[in-house]
Amino acid sequence: MLKIEGLVLASSSKYRLALLEQIGVVPGEVVSPNIDESLLKGELPRRYCMRMARTKADAVAALRSDKFVLGADTVAYCGKRVLSKTESEDCAVRYLEMLSGRRHRVCTSVCLRSPGGIVHERSVVSVVKFKSMSKGEIEYYISSGQWRGKAGGYGIQGFAGALISWIQGSYSSIAGLPLHETYCLLCGYFDLKHIP
């Protein structure tokens, strides 16, 4: 593991930190950004995702201007409809019923902001297909509480992973941080090549 004191992760997600650690990187600090995550009228899902990742990085960079700041955001969507982070059981049930037996997309955007204000952004869009879920499977998932605060009402890292019949794209991106793209961005500034 390489602890990078000059890197701040702008996130409140323990999963993003764990994903970053998978590529051998430990940020010097983790700061939860306090931002407005409201969707703008007419805003398309990918644009929204990119804006949120950059807004998170910008908000934390305003507090840590001498550091590199890494922000990310994940958005699940069906067509143009953004499936926001779920905070209620009713919302999670609605999302899961809508996603049952269907494909949807998950976009994760990552933004790296340098101390000099240079911004690098990448986005990865993946396709996810849930199996046709029974009422019992949905109820079990809801009772697990794993839906809380998750885009689309699920996290692929938990039991929901057993309900997903296939994905096209990046597993790590669906989980919250596209590792290949993040690694490439960080390699532009930090020597990560010695990490096994």
From Swiss-Prot:
Organism expressing this protein natively: Anaplasma marginale (strain Florida)
* Chief location category: cytoplasm
Cellular compartments per GO CC? cytoplasm
Q: Does the keyword Transport apply?
A: no
One biological process GO term for this chain?
A: nucleotide metabolic process
- Record flagged with keyword Hydrolase: yes
> Its catalytic activity?
a ribonucleoside 5'-triphosphate + H2O = a ribonucleoside 5'-phosphate + diphosphate + H(+); a 2'-deoxyribonucleoside 5'-triphosphate + H2O = a 2'-deoxyribonucleoside 5'-phosphate + diphosphate + H(+)
* Cofactor(s) needed for function: a divalent metal cation
- List the InterPro entries hit by this protein, alphabetically: ITPase-like_fam, Maf-like
Cysteines joined through disulfide linkages? none
SUPFAM superfamilies registered for this protein in UniProt:
ITPase-like
Family affiliation? Belongs to the Maf family.
Q: What is its EC number?
A: 3.6.1.9
Q: State the protein's purpose.
A: Nucleoside triphosphate pyrophosphatase. May have a dual role in cell division arrest and in preventing the incorporation of modified nucleotides into cellular nucleic acids.
- What is its EC class? hydrolase
Protein name per its UniProtKB record: Nucleoside triphosphate pyrophosphatase
Entry-linked HAMAP family = Maf
Catalytic residues (positions): 73
State its location(s). Cytoplasm
Q: Which GO terms describe its molecular function?
A: nucleoside triphosphate diphosphatase activity
Q: Name the keywords, alphabetized.
A: Cytoplasm, Hydrolase, Nucleotide metabolism
